[in-house]
Amino acid sequence: PLLTPWMGRCALVWALLLALCSTPAGAQTRLRAWNVHPEGYPVTEAMKSFAEDVKKSTQGRYQIEVFSNAVLGDQPKAVQMIKGGELDIAEFSMGPLSDVVPGVRVLSLPFLFHDSAHMFRYLDGALGERYAASLKAAGFVVLGWYDGGARSFYCATRKPSSLRDLAGANIRVRSEIFTEMVQLLDAKPIPLAFKDVLEAFEKGSIDCAENNIPSYESTGHYKVAKHVYVTNHVVSPEVLLVSTALWSKLSEPDRAAFQEAGKRSALLMRELWNKRVAQAQEAMGKQGVQFTRVKDVSPFVRRMSPLYAKYMNDPSTREALLTIIANK
């Protein structure tokens, strides 16, 4: 017999009910988040807070597991993983990203920013939005700017107190811009993965490295390199990113939830960072670490002139560099 209108409506209702039953209520999507830092580090703690925020604001539909200590691969590999959609969320310094987004290199220029407050004045505004657009075009969506801290030199075999004390030293570097910086200081750059620095110190294949104080402490580098030359030569950001592959699948409300959680995690990270710097300096002093502050940065700044000239002549970095220098 032919279906009556009433029977047709009943069939439609049953079909809808069956469809609802076949998709479990509150279905979860599990995501992976990566960083290079250890457990308890400000970055890791801020990312865990981000994960909890996302879980709460999406009613548990997105479960994010944070993998610290680069357990899913080193930084260059992780960049390619998130770019290819194999990784969902990650936090990077500018060095590993510079190969795919050359314009971010300017953010690692020596003596560009006075301190973190000066840096975030730009990144929390129009300049940060400009970089976010460049990163999105390369496959990354910015969720928040983290504090990469102020970097200084630390040495095992030398006790530097002036520019000339670094001449001839084997210094670990992480990227091209740091290689150029070290060469301009008449020292020898030694490219090494972050995880290999401690062993290199122990073997004597490097004299010095450079990083921020919390990283110096958390890695145990202070155990073999007890002489810190506080130059604060680079104040640079790190960034929390989500892959465009994931972003394209998110609804507008879920995108808003991720963005708000990212902003909150960035503010938390900066707060945790400032506390960690103070704690690390105090702890290192008790471990016999010697801190020598640079008396005059002008000799260092003058040495960097060729580096600034190079980036001023590069179309991908000129505009951002001019924006920052004009307002220093």
Spell out what each predicted region is.
Residues 1-8:
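N-terminal secretory signal peptides that target proteins for export/translocation
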Residues 23-27:
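Sec/Tat signal peptide C-region and signal peptidase I cleavage site
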Residues 9-22:
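Bacterial N-terminal signal peptides
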Residues 28-118, 126-127, 133-328:
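N-terminal secretory/targeting leader peptides
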